[in-house]
């Protein structure tokens, strides 16, 4: 799969996928990486150490700093893949140095899959 580079870098890991948008501010605990938004498909699951796949971000611009706090706490996702990366998630990935790609058909990815991402080239490979 090929997408557009948001922030370069490489990562290899397990997909955590949702069809719902994510608000990092108020929706994700910056100390634990657990999604805390009530009723969210990923409520109670941790983004830490995962290839986080979701359509786009939502909510406050403070979400960029929540991604940064996750990074500083060692609880950030390994990489982010979106259909369309919003400015809040883009800035969060850049300041936190989280590899990120968008313009991807995320329906081809499923929770638990192993993937490799080379965000500099926008390439996502599904491991066998």
Where are the predicted features?
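Feature captures the catalytic cores and cofactor-binding loops of soluble hydro-lyases/lyases
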Residues: 3-11, 16-125
